[in-house]
């Protein structure tokens, strides 16, 4: 793992090359990151060339696994795309700089907000409904604001992968893996001796197709676990874009309604909160 000063030095150099002046990053704080990623917050020394007072620096070390390492390019493109959106549709932080060779991203600092997981854990029934309503509104604004922009996202992805051998194929393979997992899930259930009705098989087949094409397509981070959603200034922001892209937006809705099935600590939702979420979306 690179030591902290080296990662921060790289980030300062990236910002200097992009914005001019001589950027300095101090008061470095290590943050929680997903997987092997190193994530830091740093304060920016006052500089007329750069208006942000603090930034978040993320480094994703190469693992040697092509499929795993391809996530960095996807995340970079997703942040490029999200940054180009209007503030009302933008799902999360702004991309301030990056270096694909060093595998470093620099994004705006959202501050010390609480995660959706923390908010749900502390909520009573009424607050729970308000939280889900606010989440539905945030998702709906992102989906509505990006529904017609898939070509723009694809152009950015093509530019990023064009000069990198096999990179485009790896991105397509990662998308197909999501569809493949549905088939695996059906096989696992069947292997456990559970009878699968024909209607469920048909639904699973339809879902596989809608992951890759058709449906109500919009931009989504697609990893909507409550610890990847942060609330600041009374608004929700979505983090971690390693699986981001254009997919049927109803997958995001279903993921919330199903109580975040990939996040075992999620609080069960009551019917009123679920209805409020869907109505707001």
What are these regions (language model features)?
Residues 1-8, 155-208:
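Active-site catalytic-loop/activation-segment of kinase and kinase-like phosphoryl-transfer enzymes
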Residues 1-30:
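Juxta-kinase regulatory segment immediately upstream of eukaryotic protein kinase catalytic domains
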Residues 20-26, 77, 202-214:
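Short Pro/Gly-enriched beta-strand edge/turn motifs at strand-loop
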Residues 31-51, 56, 203-251:
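Active-site acidic catalytic loop and adjacent metal/ATP-binding pocket
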Residues 36, 43-159:
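ATP-binding pocket architecture of kinase catalytic cores
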Residues 118-127, 238-245, 259-265:
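Short helix/strand-bridging catalytic loops that position acidic/His residues to coordinate divalent metals
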Residues 149, 189-195, 263-269:
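Inter-helical turn/loop segments and adjacent helix faces that build the functional surface
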Residues 251-281:
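Active-site activation/catalytic loop segments of kinase-like enzymes and analogous catalytic loops
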């Amino acid at each position: 793992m690179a030591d902290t000063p080296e990662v921060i030095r790289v980030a300062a150099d990236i910002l200097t090359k992009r914005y001019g002046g001589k950027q300095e990053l101090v008061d470095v704080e290590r943050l929680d990151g997903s997987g092997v990623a190193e994530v830091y917050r740093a304060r920016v020394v006052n500089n007329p060339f750069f208006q942000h007072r603090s930034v978040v620096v993320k480094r994703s070390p190469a693992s040697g696994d092509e499929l795993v390492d391809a996530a960095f390019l996807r995340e970079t493109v997703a942040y490029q795309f999200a940054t180009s959106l209007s503030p009302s549709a933008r799902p999360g932080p702004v991309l301030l700089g990056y270096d694909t060779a060093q595998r470093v991203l620099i994004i705006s600092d959202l501050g010390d907000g609480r995660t959706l997981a923390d908010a749900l854990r502390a909520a009573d029934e009424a607050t729970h409904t308000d939280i889900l309503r606010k989440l539905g509104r945030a998702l709906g604004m992102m989906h509505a604001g990006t529904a017609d922009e898939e070509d723009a996202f694809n152009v950015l992805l093509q530019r990023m992968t064009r000069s990198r051998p096999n990179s485009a194929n790896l991105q397509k393979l990662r998308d197909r893996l999501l569809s493949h997992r549905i088939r695996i899930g059906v096989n696992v259930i069947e292997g456990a001796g559970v009878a699968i009705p024909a209607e469920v098989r048909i639904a699973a087949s339809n879902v596989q197709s809608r992951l890759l094409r058709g449906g109500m397509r919009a931009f989504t981070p697609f990893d909507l676990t409550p610890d990847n959603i942060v609330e600041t200034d009374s608004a929700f922001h979505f983090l971690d874009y390693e699986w981001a892209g254009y997919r049927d937006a109803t997958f995001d809705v279903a993921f919330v309604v199903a109580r975040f099935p990939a996040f075992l600590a999620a609080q069960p939702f009551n019917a009123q909160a679920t209805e409020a979420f869907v109505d707001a979306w």
